[in-house]
């Protein structure tokens, strides 16, 4: 199926910002003359003072680099003030609540007023340029207001996903030295309350330096209040002045810190700066999603993750877009929720995660067919590689074969999309992220660090910096160098494996730590998972390696079946043969364990570390499980593990 090619529809080639010829020209200029290219495209945002040098520094030595040196700007000014004259009364944010009966429309003028007032509230709490504020809010409009207010006065925000535990919150507050925490009484998810204020109180037992807690009354739930420390959001905003001049920021001043899990140790505080990040997110949002004035754009991510930072708030608002914020989940109140929202708000561009698509696919076509979706013109995926079967299901059923799919590859560290189709320029191959975005120079290297030419598989690295890239790990530049530049000095190591095909298209094969070495042969787990999911019985699978006496590592597959299939030994044998046929004998699974569900974080990522431990029977040392969406799933898997040892051998 990976051989399918979907050419660019003629209508897209004509109407899009970029056809193939334009892409090739722009890409060539962006890598041959990055200073000229980015100097030109940086004019898309407003600068208080122009830069003196577009790009300096390198990946060598101490790994320090700058973009738009000495340029002065303000992110909130670019997202709000400069849009007021032309589109003050245009809707900036459509907020769709967890309850399908609840939504709000917030214009640029209203958002600007709220942001200025809240920026003054932050100043009144003693916050100034360079200080850090921790934001622990659900997907409500106040989250957008809080981050833009921080940006307006030069306060560095650290947003903590509202699904994280008190321990995770405390660790992030302590690491960044946050003085103020902005939270809510409760969040809502699928009709169930999330005790955010209670979690905050628990976390603050370990954070003596937090001086103020600003609380949004979202559900009205009864929560603890600490007089003298807690500030009521609504009262404070009402009393604040709507006049707040934007702080003049240097292009290299920090904008935000966002924590991402490392393969070892505590989460890393990825630090993004102001000028390069905004230029990169705005340009990539316009070109990747072919965003035209009047389009309604919906990225389903949570703002607690980088996708929400870059492609719900900063990129879209810098482009004067109408962006949708969604508090809910795909299956509440039922499995048609996404598509009902699409119809309700006449969404044109829809960007979601493969894990959501696979969950929807498992429910069949009926919940999709129950809706119109005729407003959709473009679909996107983000967060992990999408297997060709899920891609085709999405293309055929959701987009009804009329909507191109932009399968985007990037990371918290990269700030924005690095490898992606452009809808008017790129012929699509299901499962491939296709080609690099402007200014991005990917390459594939083998484990010894030799650069591969032409088709080949290996580690994905990036040769040169780009404007949206992280500058350091907050408070730990050594860890930054160690993590990203020590394996192959002078090159940014992504930690992902990739394959480049004969057309120069990139296929992301999964994390390098998700590689299994079977009898000296390297296998990407994503490849085996794709083969399993291609079987009509399989809804989802996760594959890990486990210690094997003879082969070094064996293949252990967790398989979730579609609703109308029953597990049996016959089906297990059939799946083994299927994988052998799809990939070859080297990929034969040693064990297949039936899994009613897979352990996932609240952002939908499968926690493979836990699956590896269970496969290796190291169940008394599962490590940190606080980010699990459904802890009961793990208990089920452990219970089933013993049965697999005796009967699950494939």
From Swiss-Prot:
Its EC number is 6.2.1.1. The keyword Ribosomal protein does not apply. CoA binds at residues 189-192, 307, 331, 519, 580. Its cofactor is Mg(2+). NCBIfam families: Ac_CoA_lig_AcsA (TIGR02188), PRK00174.1 (NF001208). Catalyzes the conversion of acetate into acetyl-CoA (AcCoA), an essential intermediate at the junction of anabolic and catabolic pathways. AcsA undergoes a two-step reaction. In the first half reaction, AcsA combines acetate with ATP to form acetyl-adenylate (AcAMP) intermediate. In the second half reaction, it can then transfer the acetyl group from AcAMP to the sulfhydryl group of CoA, forming the product AcCoA. This is Acetyl-coenzyme A synthetase. It comes from Syntrophobacter fumaroxidans (strain DSM 10017 / MPOB). The lineage of its organism: Bacteria, Pseudomonadati, Thermodesulfobacteriota, Syntrophobacteria, Syntrophobacterales.
